[in-house]
UniProtKB/Swiss-Prot annotation:
Residues 534-544, 794-807 have a biased composition (Low complexity). The gene is TRIM37. Residues 503-513, 776-788 have a biased composition (Basic and acidic residues). Ubiquitous. Highly expressed in testis, while it is weakly expressed in other tissues. The keyword Acetylation applies. This is E3 ubiquitin-protein ligase TRIM37. Pathway: Protein modification; protein ubiquitination. Associates with the PRC2/EED-EZH2 complex. It is an enzyme of class 2 (transferase). It comes from Homo sapiens (Human). Belongs to the TRIM/RBCC family. Residues 132-234, 419-450, 673-700 form a coiled coil.
Length: 964
């Protein structure tokens, strides 16, 4: 075959795009023209999707792979090389000097020579010669080995290129698949996918470009080497083999690992459009709503923490009012940033159930919190009823609104924000719960600690031994102070020591109790409840709802303990003041009195079992003190709170106190009927007390020139003692009337003492206790109103060796002194003794003067008992203090009779009530004068229990001392 024919055939198998030899040939299915795959792909990708020859639409997948074309091109190349080789071989493979065929290879010179040059040329004398064919074969073998390596390298690169192409194709297919799924989604998602695709393609195209460049370099190198092998003669090939090998070595210097590329994953996030969240809004009474012309809001729709609602103008909004129905969608709560949401507003056709007739408007808008988007001209108002959207029977319009995030991504973002808000709120709640638990634990520990460290409740716990020890300690302290009356320095030091000890103890306890969260109002309400008798006893407290009120009950009991300690401190100070104020009196009388005080204190502490057993006289005092608005006196009678709480509490007005009292009364247990009855009776006593005060004022004004009333007064006292013997278990009403009579008796003592002042043969003896008690009797706001009266009644028999009461001590009888300070229970009994006689006289309807005349009298010679003279300071000059200094003979007894039961006997219901004997009135008179009786003789009251003593029940003895 000649050269021309081979060239014509080669033109057929030439690419019509690059006009070069076909590489990876492809066939156009329309015009059947052959072209390189790389050329046609670049054309279709970068230019236009049509064949460059026939202009027919063309895609890469439509090209036909012509595998046979590669074999044809190789054969044509072989034919062309063969023809060229034969022609050049005849001309080039000859010696230049001898024009002979080169047949010898000089090993020394590394040169191909002919046989003449080797034999006769003289240039290669002594050189080593080898046959040219043998050397040629060796070089061809080496070259072929390198060519094989390069081919293997080329195949690897081609496989990598194909893998990258397959990767690119997979990425394109994945992209096309995702695009088909999300074709109807928003443009934002498509742009995001295109951006992801572009980034991945840049990476892949960069990888492919580097691999393609390396492939083209190797192909050109191979073509050059093959051309040299075919075109060069043996000698030329041998001479150029070193250069070819150097080129091969340079290619091998770049390792194959540098061409291994990381595959780009063909994954594109599938962001499918979420479904709508919908709600229905029924506008009832649409005609009425149109007349109002106000917007109507639908119930909120909660979606992923977002709050949507429909805002409807039934009569239109703005310029379209009266013509169109205006409907808007409002985002009332959500993310603070602006976000786009798709919404749909649908008006239901009510004439038929055909959904296709519903009016649907949908759009996507950027919403901010509080912003509305919608349609000002949603539908004409005049066509609502005609078109069937307004139900004429029900006068209703049904609107359905739907909203959604444009993508799941945005919906997930909203949910994440909502979850964050919920977690923050939950964390806050958990923190608050933990804080409350810590506070509860601290309060429980403080309450337990205060219960362990607080002093025992001496007034509420009769079985508490510590109370007896505390009382004994105070009695011993009183003995020491009374015995050392003249030494005021020692008295003051002992008093300060005791006050410091009590103060430290109270401050420690108050610090443990109130170092935190005690509310002043709550403390004051608890105080009001306690003072009004609304606090439950220990037994009733135990049966209450302990699960809810455990802490409150413990706190209340702890406060009661502290306040009773304060009250004990005040009692100790009172006795210390009495002891320090009377150094001029006989000090030996205080020794026996203090012993009796100690014993009385022990029995008194065992007499009170709960707050319900508080002495009724103290409760009656409360009413009197409330009128005076005296908080100090009020808390002096009852346990009072710590000093730190006293100042803000004392600043309250009376109105605030009454309001707080009423607010605190709801805490009163339902089973405290007895306290309610006591309150009612105290109110009655209060009214009667006012009348008695008026009567006393009249008596005081009319008795300025009264005669000697010693015998009459003494008889009245005996009548009071007799009445007291019959009233051991009297009710609160009787006790109230007893209190009413105190001031009257005190005035009688004052008047008689004034008349007998000049007739007293004995020097005046100062009685601090009597003075102090009488001062409290004259002042209605003080605590112990008639203590001086009781003590004056009992003074005057130093020689009496008989025990005046079950609770009096022999030592007190031996030293019988007017300075004996009786315990509270004995004082209350004496108050009861003083009151009955005057109450009987007052309520019998007699005038004030006649009441005084008809009091029970005793003869001056009855059992030798007499009352000599009383000295008293000028009442007019010292009207505020009302101090009385009675002077009694040494024969006066300092203790009451055994027939008179003490107040502790009444409260504790002891056996004294069962052992009472009834005697005559004369016997009662005999029992009053104890100087002539033997020590073992007991006299009792002749009046039975439970009867009211009237004027007719008393004995009136006329004597020379009973005159006016």
């Amino acid at each position: 075959m000649d050269e021309q024919s081979v060239e014509s055939i080669a033109e057929v198998f030439r690419c019509f795009i690059c006009m070069e030899k076909l590489r990876d040939a492809r066939l156009c299915p329309h015009c059947s023209k052959l072209c390189c795959f790389s050329c046609i792909r670049r054309w279709l990708t970068e230019q236009r999707a049509q064949c460059p020859h026939c202009r027919a639409p063309l895609q890469l997948r439509e090209l036909v792979n012509c595998r046979w074309a590669e074999e044809v091109t190789q054969q044509l190349d072989t034919l062309q090389l063969c023809s060229l080789t034969k022609h050049e071989e005849n001309e080039k493979d000859k010696c230049e000097n001898h024009h002979e065929k080169l047949s010898v290879f000089c090993w020394t010179c590394k040169k191909c020579i002919c046989h003449q040059c080797a034999l006769w040329g003289g240039m290669h004398g002594g050189h080593t010669f080898k046959p040219l064919a043998e050397i040629y074969e060796q070089h061809v073998t080496k070259v072929n080995e390198e060519v094989a390596k390069l081919r293997r390298r080329l195949m690897e690169l081609i496989s990598l290129v194909q893998e990258v192409e397959r990767n690119v194709e997979a990425v394109r297919n994945a992209k096309d698949e995702r695009v088909r799924e999300i074709r109807n989604a928003v443009e934002m998602m498509i742009a995001r996918l295109d951006t992801q695709l572009k980034n991945k393609l840049i990476t892949l195209m960069g990888q492919k470009t580097s691999l393609t460049q390396e492939t083209e370099l190797l192909e050109s190198l191979l073509q050059e080497v093959e051309h040299q092998l075919r075109s060069c003669s043996k000698s030329e090939l041998i001479s150029k083999s070193s250069e070819i090998l150097m080129m091969f070595q340079q290619v091998h210097r770049k390792p194959m690992a540098s061409f291994v590329t990381t595959p780009v994953p063909p994954d594109f996030t599938s962001e499918l459009v979420p479904s709508y969240d919908s709600a229905t809004f029924v506008l009832e009474n649409f005609s009425t709503l149109r007349q109002r012309a106000d917007p109507v809001y639908s119930p909120p729709l909660q979606v992923s923490g977002l709050c949507w609602r429909l805002k409807v103008y039934p009569d239109g909004n703005g310029v379209v009012r009266g013509y169109y129905l205006s409907v808007f969608l409002e985002l009332s709560a959500g993310l603070p940033e602006t976000s786009k949401y798709e919404y749909r507003v649908e008006m239901v056709h009510q004439s038929c159930n055909d959904p296709t007739k519903n009016i649907i408007r949908e759009f996507a808008s950027d919403f901010e919190v509080g912003e509305c988007w919608g349609y000002n001209r949603f539908f004409r108002l005049d066509l609502l009823a005609n078109e069937g959207y307004l139900n004429p029977q029900n006068d209703t319009v049904i609107l359905r609104f739907q909203v959604r995030s444009p993508t799941f991504f945005q919906k997930s973002r909203d949910q994440h924000w909502y979850i964050t808000q919920l977690e923050a709120a939950q964390t806050s709640y958990i923190q608050q719960i933990n804080n409350l638990k810590e506070r509860l634990t601290i309060e429980l520990s403080r309450t337990q600690k205060s219960r362990d460290l607080s002093p025992p409740d001496n007034h509420l716990s009769p079985q508490n031994d510590d109370a007896l020890e505390t009382r004994a300690k105070k009695s011993a302290c009183s003995d020491m102070l009374l015995e050392g009356g003249p030494t005021t320095a020692s008295v003051r030091e002992a008093k300060e020591d005791e006050e410091d000890e009590e103060k430290i103890q109270n401050e420690d306890y108050h610090h443990e109790l109130s170092d935190g969260d005690l509310d002043l109002d709550l403390v004051y309400e608890d105080e009001v409840n306690q003072l009004d008798g609304s606090s439950s006893s220990a037994s009733s407290t135990a049966t209450s709802n302990t699960e809810e009120n455990d802490i409150d009950e413990e706190t209340m009991s702890g406060e009661n303990d502290v306040e009773y300690n304060n009250m004990e401190l005040e009692e100790g100070e009172l006795m210390e003041d009495a002891a320090a104020a009377g150094p001029a009196g006989s000090s030996h009388g205080y020794v026996g009195s203090s012993s009796r005080i100690s014993r009385r204190t022990h029995l008194c502490s065992a007499a009170t079992s709960s707050l319900l057993d508080i002495d009724p006289l103290i409760l009656i005092h409360l009413l009197d003190l409330k009128d005076r608005s005296s908080i100090e006196n009020l808390w002096g009678l009852q346990p009072r709170p710590p000093a730190s709480l006293l100042q803000p509490t004392a600043s309250y007005s009376r109105k605030d106190k009454d309001q707080r009292k009423q607010q605190a009364m709801w805490r009163v247990p339902s089973d405290l009927k007895m306290l309610k009855r006591l309150k009612t009776q105290m109110a009655e006593v209060r009214c009667m007390k006012t009348d008695v005060k008026n009567t006393l004022s009249e008596i005081k004004s009319s008795s300025a020139a009264s005669g000697d009333m010693q015998t009459s007064l003494f008889s009245a006292d005996q009548a009071a003692l007799a009445a007291c013997g019959t009233e051991n278990s009297g009710r609160l009403q009787d006790l109230g009337m007893e209190l009413l009579a105190k001031s009257s008796v005190a005035n009688c003592y004052i008047r008689n003492s004034t008349n007998k002042k000049s007739n007293s043969p004995k020097p005046a003896r100062s009685s601090v206790a009597g003075s102090l008690s009488l001062r409290r009797a004259v002042d209605p706001g003080e605590n112990s109103r008639s203590k001086g009266d009781c003590q004056t009644l009992s003074e005057g028999s130093p020689g009496s060796s008989q025990s005046g009461s079950r609770h009096s001590s022999p030592r007190a009888l031996i030293h019988g002194s007017i300075g004996d300070i009786l315990p509270k229970t004995e004082d209350r009994q004496c108050k009861a003794l003083d009151s009955d006689a005057v109450v009987v006289a007052v309520f019998s309807g007699l005038p004030a003067v006649e009441k005084r005349r008809k009091m029970v009298t005793l003869g001056a010679n009855a059992k030798g008992g007499h009352l000599e003279g009383l000295q008293m300071t000028d009442l007019e000059n010292n009207s505020e203090t009302g101090e009385l200094q009675p002077v009694l003979p040494e024969g006066a007894s300092a203790a009451p009779e055994e027939g008179m039961s003490s107040d502790s006997d009444i409260e504790c219901d002891t056996e004294n009530e069962e052992q009472e004997e009834h005697t005559s009135v004369g016997g009662f008179h005999d029992s009053f004068m104890v100087m002539t009786q033997p020590p073992d003789e007991d006299t009792h009251s002749s009046f039975p229990d439970g009867e009211q003593i009237g004027p007719e029940d008393l004995s009136f003895n006329t004597d020379e001392n009973s005159g006016r």
